[in-house]
């Protein structure tokens, strides 16, 4: 009995830590704004004709949706889009529509400079610069691990900001790894 209790007390902080990390990630993604290149699906419970699967958003980031017509998705969160569709269907077509929007695929981030395989890569929730470099094949021999810059897609000034390898990467970000001279 004592062994089981000791094991439970030892394991509990780890389990709670994992839950907290997942909750923090989910919270960050709840603020995620849709944009060109994202792939989304829309479902309305019990209404198969209103289901739209894996729609890749174009540069205009609009979709044609039954009953509602053209809907602009760019800059909206999943919650905002669900509310927009729910409000549009409620009363006109359904009494209490249950709308679910899922992001199937996030738009890419880009990495260049002293990287083995520069280019665009699909974003993954929880992505850091370190993980992005790994996805791109790692640093080249002459890469500076301290001179790493990000241009954030959502920054109106498009300013290049110096970051470390633990910095968070967002969809649409451009990462540049500079060359080390020594």
Report residues per predicted region.
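Ser/Thr/Pro/Gly-biased, low-complexity, turn-/loop-rich segments
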Residues: 2, 20-182
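Bacterial N-terminal signal peptides that target proteins for export
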Residues: 1-7
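Bacterial N-terminal signal peptides
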Residues: 8-17
